[in-house]
Every structure is written in structure tokens, then in C-alpha cells.
């Protein structure tokens, strides 16, 4: 009788537990499910720039060289990419409508970054570890009679005991020079996008990342300086030497500049590069065949001519050759 009652009590507890689990599952099903994060699915999401604190001309910003990134603040309705390192204090409606997509860097860029990281390493810890491994793996030296003392202690007052102390000099190579100024050599534009490419000085100071400064300017004559229409926007930590600016305004002029950065700091901004998007005219050309224009330029080369003392002529010789 007692066993039967105990069996019934056990069945009742099991039924209560099943009922509680069922109620808990129903409560969990009624909770709103979290949205799936598309940023974790696609790592090639484009990023947006940050507005600078003050409004001014891009040329003035480059001359003063006092550009500071805004401090990152949490924004609830921000739709920036997860790759972006900082978010501005403005709401998402005031963020830069211009998007930037970075292409995959070439092998030379990664080679320069790898060379810079290897230069930071110190060879002294490696030598010290190798020495410790040799001591650990090598044969144990036989203790001399002078080292044998009572209870295994070492007699430091024994003059026969010879001790040596040596220190290794730590040698580390750290980048101390700032990176060179990039040179923008090509751009391809249509009515809403622009692909900008610049050079990377291989074999010189390594580059960790680039910064790009962009500003919309009013159309002016060739000899006039561009007039700013709004505040500049900056794109930070760009890996690679080619970027694609998207969602630009048609028939609009832009001005941009690029600078490199490494462990020593940031380099100088390059000269402002001016380009313009094409006008949207579907009456002349169909939408299925958009027109794009590519502009390339070469970096100016400087030639240094040295003249020795033996090649220089005296003043009287010049007067004889070129009489007045």
C-alpha cells in the first residue's frame, strides 16, 4: 500500500514537472524573436564616414592638419557596418549618405604590413628561449665537491666556486619615420559611384591603414579654389589602395585627400584631388548601358642635376662666351 502511494506521488510530481516545462516553452515561444544580424553573415558590408566637428574648406583642413576623429558614442538607430571602428554622435538620419567599399588589398600591401610587424619583434626573447631550451635539454653538469654541502645547500663563501653573470643586449627595430604621402593616380566615375586608386610606396616605411577625407564642393573655374558646400567627411582605417564611393549625387563635384598611418603616427595629406560625377541623362543613353569615365595621371618626377667645381666656369669665361 505504501509503495503504491509512493508510486502515485512520483507520477504526480512528474506530471507537474512536465506541465511546468510545457508552460515555460509556451512562454518562450511568445517572446519576440531577435532579428538575425545580417552584418555577421556578410563581412563585405559597406561603411559610412564620420562628419567633422566644424564646417570649413577641405584645403584649410589639410593646411592646419588638425583633424580629429569624433569620440565613439552608442547610437541606437545606427545602420553603420560592424567593421566601422567609431560611430559619430549624430543620429542615423544625419550620417553621411555616401558609402565606401574597400577592395581587397594586393599582395604588396600585405607584404609591407608584414614587414612592419616583423620589424617590431625583438630577437632577444627568442635567443633567451633557445638558451633555456638548451639548458633544459642538455646533460646535467656533474656537481663538484665544492658545491656539495650539508643538506644539499650551496656554499657561497667557497672561493673555489666560480660564478658568471651575463646580460644580453635587447635589440628591437621599431618604425620611427612617418609614412610617405600617397599619390592618387586614377579615378573612374559614373552618375552615382566613383572608384579612387592611389599608389603605395613599396620598400619604404610600412603602412598600417589609410584615412580618406571627402567633401562636396561647388563648381568653380579651373584657376579658382573649390568652395565648400558642407562639412568634410572622413573614412578611417582603410586597408588597401582602392576604394569605391557609392550613392554620390549626379553632376556633382567632390574633393578628397588621402593620408597613410603606421605605428609612428599619421603622414601628410596628399594634395586635394578633384573629380565630378556624370549627369543623369536617360534621353541620350539608355539606362541599361551606363557611361563611365576613367582618368589616369602620372606622378611628376624630379630630376636632380649635380655640377662639380671642375664643370663650373668662371665669370670671365662666361663673359667671353656670351659678350654683352
Curated annotation (Swiss-Prot):
CDD domains: FN3. Gene3D superfamilies: Immunoglobulins (2.60.40.10). Pfam families: fn3. Disulfide bonds: none annotated. Residues 179-280 form the Fibronectin type-III domain. GO terms for cellular component: nucleus. SMART domains: FN3 (SM00060). PANTHER family: FIBRONECTIN TYPE III DOMAIN-CONTAINING PROTEIN 8. This is Fibronectin type III domain-containing protein 8. The lineage of its organism: Eukaryota, Metazoa, Chordata, Craniata, Vertebrata. The gene is FNDC8.
